Amino acid sequence: MPLPQVAIVGRPNVGKSTLFNRLLRQRRAIVEEVPGTTRDRIYGIVEWNDLRFGLFDTGGLLTEEEIERSSERELVEATKAQAELAIAEADLVIFVVDASAGPTAGDWEVADFLRRTDKPILLVANKAESREREFNALQFYELGLGDPIPVSALHGRGIADLLDAIAERLPRREEDGTAEAEAPKIAIVGRPNVGKSALLNAILGQPRQIVSPIPGTTRDAVDTELVWKGQPIVLIDTAGIRRPGRIERGIERYSILRAERAIERSDVAILVVDATEPFTHQDQAVAGKVLDAKKGIVVAINKWDLFEHMEGEGAREAFEEDAREAFHFMPWAPLVFVSALTGKNVEHVVDLALVVVAERSRRIPTAELNQLLREAIAHHPPPTRPGKWVKFYYVTQPEVNPPTFVFFCNRPQLVHFSYKRYLENRIRERYGFLGTPIELVFRERERSAPAWERGKAGRS
């Protein structure tokens, strides 16, 4: 089952990031950055006793009046969107307030907003470094969110009690080893109004056995586990996600953030685009997120029935050329012309996604890879510099998902990007790897020990 998620929210300068870092230092923690659109959303995994949970840090929430007065309106809107996204995905929200300041108008506004989310909330009064501050923390009871938990994130005071409180309120998700853990996860992503919801419904309308709905990590989405032609799969839905906003860019930014989280959990993303509209920067941005996450991708060109009706014969070839130009950075991604309304090619989209899943897990024998490398070098040797040249020794594939190839050579820093692209193209020409990015890594081969030392080591 997915890890339970916890979001830390509150107004600026109450110590949210300090608390985040303090929680991650408990036991063993893995920290990673989850890129946002203007600021990074920071995400980590916390382990406490027998519990593991994901933890989001968010930017400070301003009051509506402060937002109106802000000279960085766009940045403030982005920060607010990040926080709202984290709250929507959370199983539990930690609302951090400042015990040294007492309740403020900003605290009241955040509290009112959190009440409307119907999320479980832990009220945490930070900066309670003394008994007097702990007593002051009691004032926050008037916010109506339960008893405040006094802590000092800076000094670690009260952190164990806070972690125990988190453990009590989070849902327990058993690792039962059922099909969901092994089933390929396919995310349906794209900008608003391209037909993601219609495509999902068309897929679910195909004849198959729906096993069970799985609660997703977002407020608006439900992951669905089903059996597709004998193969268990999980569909991750990001369809129908909208955020009321004053400006279009805010809505656009929010939709990309939602798609981002779905992509992180997926193996393959079906990127839905609208055939009746020109390709946009947002289409490219969502595709870029898939590649950044090193996931597989299938491009589903939806509403094709409408476009074909308007444009007539020859429309497909011209459109495919435009699509290849728009997504020039992933020429290996398959394109599928579909109509969620009529059901045309809907089945083919899922079939292709499963092909991409298989491609991502392919391993190529080392002997075959080295034969390919020798042929590639013979056909086009690596460029040389005066007095310097690149000599390749061998190549191997140590990893899958995505397929990763490590080339050992004498001067990896001299391998030009154009030659890297050449080697990738040769790999794809022979082995395909449809719909998945592949990683090429260039390393200097470790110098072998002298023969007499190797013999001595073998006898010891």
Curated annotation (Swiss-Prot):
Disulfide bonds: none
Residues bound to GTP 2: 190-197, 237-241, 302-305
Keywords on record: GTP-binding, Nucleotide-binding, Repeat, Ribosome biogenesis
Residue sites binding GTP 1 per the record: 10-17, 57-61, 126-129
SUPFAM superfamilies named among the record's database cross-references: P-loop containing nucleoside triphosphate hydrolases
Location of the KH-like domain: 362-446
Domain EngA-type G: from-to ranges: 4-174, 184-361
GO BP annotations listed: ribosome biogenesis
GO molecular function, one term: ribosome binding
Function summary: GTPase that plays an essential role in the late steps of ribosome biogenesis.
PANTHER family listed in its UniProt record: GTPASE DER
NCBIfam families named among the record's database cross-references: GTPase_EngA (TIGR03594), small_GTP (TIGR00231)
Assembly with partners or alone: Associates with the 50S ribosomal subunit.
UniProt family annotation: Belongs to the TRAFAC class TrmE-Era-EngA-EngB-Septin-like GTPase superfamily. EngA (Der) GTPase family.
Name under which the protein is recorded: GTPase Der
